[in-house]
Amino acid sequence: MRKIWELKKKEAQKEKNASGISPAQIRIQKDVTDLEIPSTMSTSWPDPIKLNVLHLEIRPDEGYYKGGKFKFRIQIDDNYPHDPPKVKCLNKIYHPNIDIEGNVCLNILRQDWNPVLNLNSILVGLQFLFLSPNAEDPLNKEAAADLHKDPQGFASRVRTAMKGGLVNGISFDNVMA
């Protein structure tokens, strides 16, 4: 299996050298062209020449996080689509699947990733985290336990955190739109 991976890397490097554009860049261009951005999201590129870094803003219109603006950075490396993009939440938020450092727990960004998935898949997955947080597979175990044991209290603490308040002694970013 390792030999196959090494051969694929060599082939990709040959293709890049021949055309000046890597297979990852070609795939990223296709994914960007195929993006279907709902009204609750917006995208931007810090450098329009380099499509491998994407900024995403999610504005949920329902659920616990309704009314917030959540910013993400999506970084795509040269092994894409064989490796998933790296996604980081740029806001400090109270969420079972996003820790206070901004790391995101989404299965398609880890063990469930495969090369047929694309940027649209990631956007849909991130949006779903805000509509239906998953307490069964958390990064923020306190928030997950809170959601599981006391959904109404969790909702109240999410609102407090979204307004830039303190939850369990931790200060969160004001993300209210």
From Swiss-Prot:
The reaction(s) catalysed by this protein are: [E1 NEDD8-activating enzyme]-S-[NEDD8 protein]-yl-L-cysteine + [E2 NEDD8-conjugating enzyme]-L-cysteine = [E1 NEDD8-activating enzyme]-L-cysteine + [E2 NEDD8-conjugating enzyme]-S-[NEDD8-protein]-yl-L-cysteine
Would you indicate the residue range of the signal peptide? none
EC number(s) recorded for this UniProt protein: 2.3.2.34
List the GO molecular function terms: ATP binding; NEDD8 conjugating enzyme activity; NEDD8 transferase activity
Keywords in alphabetical order, please: ATP-binding, Nucleotide-binding, Transferase, Ubl conjugation pathway
What top-level branch of life does the organism fall under? Eukaryota
Kind of enzyme, top EC level?
transferase
Q: Does the keyword Nucleotide-binding apply?
A: yes
- Xref: InterPro entries: UBQ-conjugat_E2_core, UBQ-conjugating_AS, UBQ-conjugating_enzyme/RWD
State if Cell division is listed as a keyword.
no
Question: GO cellular component annotations, sorted alphabetically?
Answer: cytosol; nucleus
Q: Which Pfam families match?
A: UQ_con
State which pathway it belongs to.
Answer: Protein modification; protein neddylation
Please state every residue range assigned to the domain named UBC core.
Answer: 23-167
One biological-process term from Gene Ontology? Answer: protein neddylation
Q: Which residues form the active site?
A: 105
Biological role: Accepts the ubiquitin-like protein NEDD8/RUB1 from the UBA3-ULA1 E1 complex and catalyzes its covalent attachment to other proteins.
The family classification in the record reads: Belongs to the ubiquitin-conjugating enzyme family. UBC12 subfamily.
Specify the protein name: NEDD8-conjugating enzyme ubc12
The taxonomy runs: Eukaryota, Fungi, Dikarya, Ascomycota, Taphrinomycotina
Q: Name the gene.
A: ubc12
